[in-house]
């Protein structure tokens, strides 16, 4: 059935006259009567504004008029009711257009045909609807035949119009019409639409009108009922009204809504509607249509790029019905030479005028060129870099504009493997694009199996309900991580981004049975078994059954050039979050000016986990001291490697932060193990030991561990732990100083809420640093600061700053504690619904929330009151988010810190933030 479109037109009272319709193009005397320009995108949409601009600079643009974006929103917000007077205004502009052209829409002698196209303020290619050849009916078809002396062209145009109108405006399934065309070709024994004769197409028109009558409801569209049955509308004004309503309605079609959400485009902008005289590329071999770019959008090369078709309409180029020809050949085609040369001249003119690479749609009608659209062309990351640099060299833009031209998030394309764009695959499921890049490997369902697969030389993808610290070895071994639970700041997402591993999280359709080592996908009969090849794309969040070919983007000097320019403009420093020398080196290679967060808890995993468990679970002080001694030796080596790799640059080491239960066995897993032993008649002594261990672990259980015994509280209750860590930091520093290096460690105390907590632990740290300095005979100047990740810490930052050399805002936990959210739960449970219902504008764990940002701003201001020399940074996941970086720049932070692979992104975003404030 067709989609709902208001039948009878109701009027909405408006007191103030508002201009809602704008003309573009020339009048009958050749004078430009355009009422807009390229600066009016918010009103005319991108397409309408640029049509007006092309008309203003004298390019051959078919005339027409544009209905404003605001009219679309008024119409939608009033429940699909037209604002008062708008239909009368449209009628006036339609009459004006007819006078300018000297033809009338629907005229039986010499009909004017128009297109009705969408055009939002922000480019949304292919997301909304278009209707072509509007104005054809059973009378005007005869006029078109007489004027063109080409019956086949006329009937083909009418056929196309009915098909497009039925699909776009009435919502009928396009296959109804394609099936009829295919049946006709089969009967005629031909393969291509172009092989059908005028008589065939006339027969199809009659059949198409029958399909329309059978599938459109007279109850929904009473105005279309004639003699008791629905008929294809013959009144051009009815056609036009319904088409405009359909384009307005397409603003809220599912694909457009999804596109806006993905690209952070407001839902309140609306789309303009462009009503434009049709020109035809299917009037014979001196007619053509095409789409082109003024430069190569794939690699940025300065060459004309695109395709055209002779004797075709615009949708044929993108529909793939016929093989296209490269745009460079157009000027060599007989009958099209002059138009081809003129087009290339226009390419140069458009670049000179807009100072950017432009995307163009054109039609040549019997040798005469017409420009149907121009807009800033979409391009790959590699092309964006190359074009920006070339245009700076050519004098079209300066270095500042070149830096502005590259979208920071685009750089992900250059740093990670991607699905081959030519690969053929079907999407099995979708989740959150948690960590960019693509991975292919056999599915494994446990960390141990991932390690085993990697050791055997087999690539694998770790598939889990959600990951935890126990899975680290498997995450490192796997090519990528796939989880059915968790959000963009879940354990899997954070660790994957830090490692530069592709990750797709929160695939709700994925039902994982870890014991059976398989997963099913809701809504399908697919079962993913251990060893099955799967592919995932962490950039887009898609999962594919089978192996998809991957490609690694080629890095060029263009990236270094743009980032070097960016560094000259940015105010924010950019550091990295790294926990090992390998990541530290990568961070430095990517241009990080230090390490903003070294998480020491990651150093307690793997083989060392048994040591920390011994400390936690054993009451014997001698045993515990021995365990701490082993940890000291291990940590000293860790810090030595980190500080050496970052020689001369700051490394902020966060003392142990997580609750102790994270280092212990899972009670659930232990309970399952005990049940298995009992069911299989296992060793009773072993069962008893497991039960004792269970009781001991239960003693560390907390109702809300993330707000319990962790961070600085852990250091106060178990002082031996921070003492050991500080001593290891100081010892590693002293050793490197003796070797002639310049280590610059800084100690960060986490989860402080009162100045008393920080004062106590700072005193402990300074005492141990002094002891090590005396023992080693070197001078140690190690700063001590804190993380501001609790609201109380932010609002008492002036007090806390008296005991701190620096603040690092932990915006992950600050967001949790400000909202009262449990991050790992809410991202999967209700944040998606909140986003859908506009209760949240975006995920606050991905982009900093204004309320949380106010706490950061307050913390910075108060902190400087307490300590004017205080250095302030941010080390949460927001540190790599371009939108958040703009906020942090305004607040006046000194640096942001992010995962190594986000460092180039942050450098560019920081420069753009600084330029935005100029």
Regions found by a protein language model. Give the residues of each.
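Nucleotide/phosphate-binding sheet-loop regions of phosphoryl- and nucleotidyl-transfer enzymes
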Residues: 2-426, 458-461, 468-473, 479, ...
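Protease-associated
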Residues: 3, 396-477, 542-550, 559, ...
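Short, ordered loop/turn segments at secondary-structure junctions
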Residues: 66, 70-72, 467, 486-488, ...
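Conserved alpha/beta-domain cores
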Residues: 117-118, 555-558, 565-918
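A short, small-residue-rich loop immediately preceding and capping a beta-strand
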Residues: 479-485, 503, 873
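Conserved nucleotide-binding/hydrolysis modules and their immediate coupling elements
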Residues: 492, 508-512, 517-522
């Amino acid at each position: 059935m067709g989609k709902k479109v208001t039948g009878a037109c109701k009027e909405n009272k408006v007191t103030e006259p508002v201009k809602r319709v704008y003309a573009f193009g020339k009048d009958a005397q050749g004078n430009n009567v355009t009422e807009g320009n390229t600066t009016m995108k918010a009103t005319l949409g991108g397409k309408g504004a640029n049509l007006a601009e092309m008309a203003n600079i004298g390019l051959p643009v078919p005339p027409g008029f544009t209905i404003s974006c605001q009219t679309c929103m008024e119409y939608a917000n009033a429940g699909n009711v037209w604002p008062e007077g708008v239909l009368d205004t449209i009628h006036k502009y339609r009459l004006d257009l007819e006078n300018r052209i000297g033809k009338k829409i629907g005229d039986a002698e010499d009909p004017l045909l128009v297109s009705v196209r969408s055009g939002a303020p922000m480019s949304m290619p292919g997301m909304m609807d278009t209707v072509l050849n509007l104005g054809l009916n059973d009378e005007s078809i005869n006029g078109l035949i007489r004027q063109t002396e080409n019956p086949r062209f006329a009937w083909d145009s009418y056929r196309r119009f009915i098909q497009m109108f039925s699909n776009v405006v009435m919502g009928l399934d396009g296959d109804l019409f394609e099936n009829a065309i295919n049946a006709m070709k089969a009967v005629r024994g031909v393969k291509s639409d172009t092989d059908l004769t005028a008589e065939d197409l006339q027969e199809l028109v009659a059949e198409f009108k029958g399909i329309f009558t059978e599938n459109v409801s007279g109850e929904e569209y009473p105005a279309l009922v004639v003699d008791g049955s629905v008929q294809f509308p013959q009144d051009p004004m009815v056609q036009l009204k319904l088409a405009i309503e359909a384009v307005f309605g397409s603003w809220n079609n599912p694909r457009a809504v999804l596109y806006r959400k993905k690209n952070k485009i407001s839902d309140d902008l609306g789309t303009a509607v462009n009503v434009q005289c049709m020109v035809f590329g299917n009037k014979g071999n001196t007619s053509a249509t095409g789409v082109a770019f003024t430069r190569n959008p794939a690699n940025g090369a300065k060459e004309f790029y695109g395709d055209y078709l002779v004797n075709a309409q615009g949708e044929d180029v993108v529909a793939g019905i016929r093989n296209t020809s490269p745009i460079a050949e157009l000027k060599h085609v007989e009958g099209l030479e002059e138009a081809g040369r003129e087009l290339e001249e226009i390419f140069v003119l458009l670049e000179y005028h807009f100072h950017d690479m432009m995307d163009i749609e054109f039609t040549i009608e019997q040798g005469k060129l017409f420009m149907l659209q121009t807009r800033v062309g979409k391009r790959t990351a590699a092309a964006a870099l190359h074009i920006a640099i070339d245009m700076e060299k050519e004098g079209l833009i300066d270095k500042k504009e070149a830096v502005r031209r590259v979208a920071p998030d685009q750089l992900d394309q250059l740093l990670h493997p991607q699905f081959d764009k030519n690969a053929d695959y079907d999407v099995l499921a979708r989740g959150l694009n948690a960590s960019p890049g693509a991975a292919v490997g056999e599915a494994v369902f446990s960390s141990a199996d991932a390690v085993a697969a990697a050791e055997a030389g087999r690539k694998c993808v770790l598939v889990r309900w959600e990951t935890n610290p126990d899975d680290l070895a498997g995450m490192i071994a796997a090519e990528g991580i796939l989880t059915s639970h968790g959000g963009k700041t879940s354990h899997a997402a954070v660790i994957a981004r830090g490692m530069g591993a592709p990750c797709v999280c929160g695939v709700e359709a994925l039902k994982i049975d870890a014991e059976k080592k398989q997963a099913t996908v809701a809504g399908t009969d697919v079962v993913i078994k251990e060893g099955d090849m799967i592919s995932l794309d962490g950039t887009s969040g898609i999962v594919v059954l089978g192996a998809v070919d991957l490609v690694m983007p080629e890095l060029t000097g263009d990236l270094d050039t743009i980032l070097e320019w960016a560094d000259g403009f940015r105010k924010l420093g950019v550091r990295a979050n790294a926990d090992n020398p390998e990541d530290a080196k990568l961070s430095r290679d990517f241009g990080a000016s230090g390490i903003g967060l070294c998480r020491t808890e990651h150093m307690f995993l793997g083989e060392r986990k048994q040591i920390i468990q011994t400390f936690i679970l054993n009451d014997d002080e001698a045993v515990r001291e021995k365990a701490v001694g082993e940890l000291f030796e291990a940590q000293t080596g860790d810090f030595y490697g980190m500080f050496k790799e970052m020689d001369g640059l700051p490394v902020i080491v966060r003392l142990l932060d997580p609750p102790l239960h994270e280092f212990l066995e899972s009670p659930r897993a232990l309970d399952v193990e005990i049940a298995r032993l009992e069911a299989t008649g296992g060793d009773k002594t072993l069962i008893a030991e497991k039960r004792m261990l269970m009781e001991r672990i239960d003693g560390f259980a907390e109702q809300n561990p993330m707000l319990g015994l962790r961070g600085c509280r852990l250091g106060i209750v178990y002082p031996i732990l921070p003492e050991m860590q500080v001593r290891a930091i100081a010892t590693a520093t002293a050793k490197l100083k003796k070797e002639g290096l310049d280590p610059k460690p800084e100690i960060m105390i986490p989860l402080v809420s009162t100045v008393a907590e920080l004062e106590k632990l700072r005193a402990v740290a300074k005492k141990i640093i002094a002891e090590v300095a005396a023992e080693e005979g070197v001078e140690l100047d190690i700063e001590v600061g804190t993380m501001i990740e609790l609201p109380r810490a932010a609002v008492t930052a002036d007090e806390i700053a008296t005991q701190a050399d620096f603040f690092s805002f932990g915006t992950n936990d600050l967001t949790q504690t400000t909202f009262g959210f449990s991050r790992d739960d809410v991202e999967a449970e209700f944040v998606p619904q909140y986003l859908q219902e506009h209760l949240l504008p975006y995920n606050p764990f991905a982009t900093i929330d204004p309320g949380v940002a106010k706490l950061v701003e307050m913390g910075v201001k108060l902190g400087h009151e307490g300590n004017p020399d205080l250095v302030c940074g941010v080390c949460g996941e927001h540190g790599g988010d371009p939108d958040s970086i703009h906020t942090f720049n305004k607040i006046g932070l000194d640096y942001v810190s992010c995962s190594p692979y986000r460092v180039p992104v942050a450098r560019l975003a920081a420069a753009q933030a600084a330029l935005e404030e100029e």
